[in-house]
A protein has these predicted regions:
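Cytosolic, long alpha-helical scaffolding segments
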Residues: 1-126
Length: 126
């Protein structure tokens, strides 16, 4: 499943950026992104388990709805993070943090792509 692999790739590359950019302390926005991504991953796990039998399409549908809500929350976090970041005077910090924030937001987009795959499977099998 390419969509699922993309989620993992963006989480991994975002974490690697923390090391590459030598970010010693995460900020509140990164913590929020981590929480949203973790919750979306839990919904993906629940959805994958439900797809094995397709006995409970409502649970899978609920996962899709929640993942979509979490992706929207990721968009909001990015907006707030960038607004706060651009008040910073250090251009190097702006570049580093903007890159990391955008990577984590893309991870939430990729979670939504997985939810879209779930929805397509449900449509075909119900």
């Amino acid at each position: 499943m390419t969509a699922l692999d993309d989620v993992i790739d963006f989480i991994d590359s975002g974490a690697n950026m923390l090391m590459i950019y030598e970010i010693e302390k995460t900020d509140a926005f990164m913590v929020e992104f981590a929480s949203v991504i973790r919750k979306a991953a839990e919904e993906i796990r629940t959805g994958v388990a439900g797809l094995r039998t397709l006995n409970d399409p409502e649970t899978i549908k609920g996962c899709c709805i929640e993942i979509n809500r979490l992706e929207n929350q990721g968009d909001d976090i990015l907006s707030n993070a960038l607004c706060s970041l651009f008040k910073t005077k250090d251009p190097v910090e702006i570049i580093k943090f903007k890159d990391i924030y955008e990577h984590f937001e893309i991870a939430t987009d990729k979670c939504e792509d997985v939810a879209d795959v779930f929805a397509a499977i449900l449509i075909r099998h119900t």
